[in-house]
Amino acid sequence: MAPKKKKVTGLIKLQIQAGQANPAPPVGPALGAHGVNIMEFCKAYNAATENQRGNVVPVEITVYEDRSFDFKLKTPPAAKLLLKAAGLQKGSGVPHTNKVGKVTMDQIREIAETKKEDLNARDIDAAAKIIAGTARSMGITVEG
């Protein structure tokens, strides 16, 4: 007979700097409310994201009835990848009036390759259009 499936009691979504999870907010309160061992998660997350330092890595934590958990790492947010590609700190406050940076279509395709698994696009061209739209809404001009 197959083992029983664990009952899910919660799903937590967080965006944390890679390799820098600690019990302080926002991690501690979010996990503590579900009774999860916070230090155990922090150690596991930091080990899993060690090679992505400098990026914000979204994580989806599934909490089970017995207070155990597992987590799934996502790709960094498109906005963060675009800011890095354009060499900016932040996007424009009025994106359709003030343009703050430029990215090439090659950079857009590279970001689309990275994000493809998290986007609901059938191919790279569709994913690139999604990323280009994000860039425009941040005041970043797409060249090419």
Curated annotation (Swiss-Prot):
Gene Ontology MF terms: large ribosomal subunit rRNA binding; structural constituent of ribosome
Keywords for this protein: Methylation, Ribonucleoprotein, Ribosomal protein, RNA-binding, rRNA-binding
GO biological process: translation
Gene Ontology, cellular component aspect: cytosolic large ribosomal subunit
Free-text description of this protein's post-translational modifications in UniProt: One or more lysine residues are methylated.
Protein role: Forms part of the ribosomal stalk which helps the ribosome interact with GTP-bound translation factors.
PANTHER family: 60S RIBOSOMAL PROTEIN L12 (PTHR11661), LARGE RIBOSOMAL SUBUNIT PROTEIN UL11M (PTHR11661:SF1)
Quaternary structure, from the entry: Part of the ribosomal stalk of the 50S ribosomal subunit. Interacts with L10 and the large rRNA to form the base of the stalk. L10 forms an elongated spine to which L12 dimers bind in a sequential fashion forming a multimeric L10(L12)X complex.
UniProt similarity note: Belongs to the universal ribosomal protein uL11 family.
Stated name of the protein: Large ribosomal subunit protein uL11
Gene: rplK
